[in-house]
Amino acid sequence: KINKSFKAITALSMFYDLPNPNQFLLDIKKILATDGIFILEQVDLLSIVKEQLFDTICHEHLEYYSSKIIIEIAKNNHLRVFDLKKNDINGGSITYYICHENAKFKTNLKKINNIVKEENRLKLEKINTYKKLEKNIIQQKIKLISLIKKIIKDGKIIHGYGASTKGNVLLQYFKITNKFIKYIADRN
């Protein structure tokens, strides 16, 4: 048990790994100072759909959240998203600035509302949005496999360097085997 409070707490690229995000936020609330800030950064659902970031979807990520849902989960746990910032981490992420619900931080309603409006415009709550995403990913797969086959047909050999999670997701989902790429190396 922690008997201290903290003015700054961060959770970077891990919120979607949590089996119980509500309990996590309750725990954050308990240790966050009255005037403290909790900084949460993650690939968001808007970026996944808009930028077709399928390669970030893997077994360790239990779920993905829209900003609308992050705001709601925070509110349900007596916290408040008072600002957010889009960034290019992992192809597209959002950093959320969260405080206690009654903290004196001014809420950047304009920025928050703009993100939520964009999420609503893209219909993140509708299944057809994800069916369209799937079709686009299949088209990417067809194009990439065609390019790889052309390169091989031209007598060239493809080698890979950098075996990141994203690279492995792409290789597995597109079924790119050693038939296409003979060697992949990585350096840690």
Across the structure, where does each feature detected by a protein language model lie?
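Short, glycine-/aromatic-enriched active-site segment of Class I SAM-dependent methyltransferases
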Residues: L40-E63, S67-I69, A74
